[in-house]
Every structure is written in C-alpha cells, then in structure tokens.
C-alpha cells in the first residue's frame, strides 16, 4: 500500500474513536483477505529469511500482541507482509477489559495510551480462531496472560491453562506479565515470583513436548520501566530457568516526551515514538547480560527503518510493530525489512 493511499485511509480512521477505528481496520483487512485482494493492495515485502529457535521467519518484522487480540485477523496480517504474527493477549476465561474510553491517540507525539485490560473472548475462542486461519502459513506467536480476578498467588495456573490450550496451534508462546493495565501484574516481574512462574511453565513445557512430540518455545515479555539492577536479576532468572526467548518491551508508565499533550494524564501504558529510545536501551541492557544465549524480540517505538536497525544493533534478533504500524501503515513493514537487510544482514 502506497503511503499516499494509507494517508487517505488514516485521515478517515482518525476521525473515529480509536477503538472503533481499530475494529473497522481489522474488519477491512479480513474482508480484503477473504476477497483475495490483500497482496495486491499491500504490495510486496522483500524476503529476508532467518531461523531462530527452529522457527523459519520469512523476514524479521513481526506484528506485536495487542493488535489482533482475538486472533481473528491472522491470515490478513500474514498477507500484509509481516514475517510473524503474535496474537492476544488471551486469558483463560473471557473478560471485558477496563471501562471505555480506554484507548487514546497522542497524534503530535506519534503515540498511543491504552488501558485496555486484556479484553478478549478467552483462550478457547482464540485457539478456535487460529484453527480457522487456514490460509496463514507463517510463524504464529500466542501471547497469554492471567485474568484480572485471579490473584497473583494463583497466576501460574492461569498461565498454565493458556499454555496447554495454545500449545497445539502456536509456534511460540509469549508470557505477558508486564502489562500495566492489570492491577498487580507487574509484581510478577520481581525476581522470585518470576523464577517460580518460569519454573512452572518450563516444567509443563517439558511435559507437553514429551506428550506431543513438538517443542514450543516460551518467551517472556518485560516492561521498559526496570532498573539496571532489576534487568540483571531477571537475566539471571531467565538463564537459570532456561527461558527460550525474551520480548522487550511492553508499554511504559512514563510520560516523558508527552507532557505537553492534554491526554498525558490518562492512565495506561504509553507506546510509540516516546518509547523508542528507552526500549532500545532495555534491549541493550538485557543483551549485555544474556550474552547471546537467549534471543530477543525488540519492540517499542519503531516508527521507521532507522529505529528497527537500532533495535537489531542493540541486540535484538527480530522486531515487532504496533503503534508505528498505526501511524505509518503497511509501508513501514517494507521499510524496516529493507533497512535491516541493508544495515544488519543475516549471516546465513
């Protein structure tokens, strides 16, 4: 899709309530995919294949969790040119999320604040949607979380329930324990709770692999609001417990860079351009601690190809888009793939 065409579409979508615009966009993508015109509209994305943890990615640019919460637009996003698609966050039981309004654009700052709260129809419905995506043949990640009503001491059971349900359909499973929009969730990022949770997940991963004959890597998604000491502690946990992969980062509670926008006082996680630098710093800090033993997916404020390259140079193996995709459209996928291919070629 040309930048001019997306700009015209965005001018219409940005007249709508953000959550309505999101739903309309997903509906339009599904319709175009069903009519088999999506590849023509989106244009071709260059090939830049890479293999990580046994998964073969056609390129290194993925869709971050939160865009396709219900996993009902998987095939369309695959045809849009993404090298991989991560759906969710999905929870054991359906839940409505937080009260509306809960999604806000900060247009001058190219940012979004959301306090969605894991609104979804539940893991069973999500898995059924994935099974229906028969025209999707790419790498699929399933992002899972706990229900709001589940106390933290029982959180592991929620994650285990989702792990078991997602196992047959996922290429990798991402543990969301860093969203700022579920009360107390980030407490699980402390070293001891994180170690207990990861140990439970790795034990069940071994059981499921033995039962099914297939290995599904487990990733954990971390917040950007962490100190260097916390990064070092979590890195030791991840290495000791055998984490397969890391996703850095989730949205931030910081409002640095958006103070002038009247929306900056809205509660929730901030994403987009104001997060670019901090997320890259966190990727670099984790990469320094992990020393290449755990691959990193870099996400947070990728608004152009330069940002994507910076994430790779900081230590990420793959990147994901969300807010940049909202503001730039599908052309951003191609730009990032081309930039990384030129500046950070894969050693084959």
UniProtKB/Swiss-Prot annotation:
Active site: 179
Ranges that cross the membrane: none
Catalysed transformations (reactions): (S)-dihydroorotate + a quinone = orotate + a quinol
Binding site for FMN: 65-69, 89, 143, 176, 221, 249, 272, 301, 322-323
Binding site for substrate: 69, 114-118, 176, 181, 250-251
Swiss-Prot/TrEMBL keywords: Cell membrane, Flavoprotein, FMN, Membrane, Oxidoreductase, Pyrimidine biosynthesis
Subcellular location: Cell membrane
GO molecular function, one term: dihydroorotate dehydrogenase (quinone) activity
Protein EC: 1.3.5.2
Pathways involved: Pyrimidine metabolism; UMP biosynthesis via de novo pathway; orotate from (S)-dihydroorotate (quinone route): step 1/1
Enzyme class, spelled out: oxidoreductase
GO cellular component, one term: cytoplasm
Membrane topology: Peripheral membrane protein
Matching InterPro entries: Aldolase_TIM, DHO_dehydrogenase, Dihydroorotate_DH_1_2, Dihydroorotate_DH_2, Dihydroorotate_DH_cat, Dihydroorotate_DH_CS
Record text on cofactor binding: Binds 1 FMN per subunit.
Record note on quaternary structure: Monomer.
Family as reported in the entry's similarity comment: Belongs to the dihydroorotate dehydrogenase family. Type 2 subfamily.
PANTHER family: DIHYDROOROTATE DEHYDROGENASE (QUINONE), MITOCHONDRIAL, DIHYDROOROTATE DEHYDROGENASE (QUINONE), MITOCHONDRIAL-RELATED
Function: Catalyzes the conversion of dihydroorotate to orotate with quinone as electron acceptor.
Protein known as: Dihydroorotate dehydrogenase (quinone)
Source organism per UniProt: Akkermansia muciniphila (strain ATCC BAA-835 / DSM 22959 / JCM 33894 / BCRC 81048 / CCUG 64013 / CIP 107961 / Muc)
